Swiss-Prot record:
Keywords assigned by UniProt, alphabetized: Cell wall, Glycoprotein, GPI-anchor, Lipoprotein, Membrane, Secreted, Signal, Stress response
Name of the gene: TIR2
Intrachain S-S bonds: none
Protein name per the record: Cold shock-induced protein TIR2
Propeptide positions: 232-251
Induction summary: Induced during anaerobic growth and strongly by cold shock.
GO cellular component: cell periphery; extracellular region; fungal-type cell wall; fungal-type vacuole; side of membrane
GO biological process, one term: fungal-type cell wall organization
Amino acid sequence: MAYIKIALLAAIAALASAQTQEEIDELNVILNDVKSNLQEYISLAEDSSSGFSLSSLPSGVLDIGLALASATDDSYTTLYSEVDFAAVSKMLTMVPWYSSRLLPELESLLGTSTTAASSTEASSAATSSAVASSSETTSSAVASSSEATSSAVASSSEASSSAATSSAVASSSEATSSTVASSTKAASSTKASSSAVSSAVASSTKASAISQISDGQVQATSTVSEQTENGAAKAVIGMGAGVMAAAAMLL
């Protein structure tokens, strides 16, 4: 857990001081090893044949070691800019426990840092992807809503237009039907009037004709009767004259 925390802090420090992650990890490995095995480092420094001394520590390392021993936050990382990282890499290989202790810790820390970096990148990528997906989903929902609204408005407009057209056609049909009915009624009334007039005229004409015929017949009958009566009288008179003539001849 301590290495993970150091790795994360080191990553922050690397970004702040423009150092590579490997250089930060090497510094953290040596600082933690000195802190955990201080007596061994003191003994090594006292051995003149080791070529190692506390005074030969890379610049800035001792200051960071002291700050790290009492650190309660990551403020000690501000001292990283004062460290000679090239000298730190050289010092790691000078101590006799480099291969047995420092290198495994460094490899572990580098692996953790790589994992943490990968995790951070993956998290950032996932977040970006989620944001992009959310934006696309939102855009798609807004587009669908706009299309649905446009479709609803269009349908409503079409329905209104259709209803208005149907109403207008119905009104026009009703008006036409009413006009036709009125015209038909007027025509029927005119026809009835014409028929009544024609019938009345015909009846009047017929009555007049019949009257004239009747008058004619009466006149004719009267004339015939008069002529018959006159003829009969004349015949009687004639016959009387004849008889009287015959009687005279006989006498």
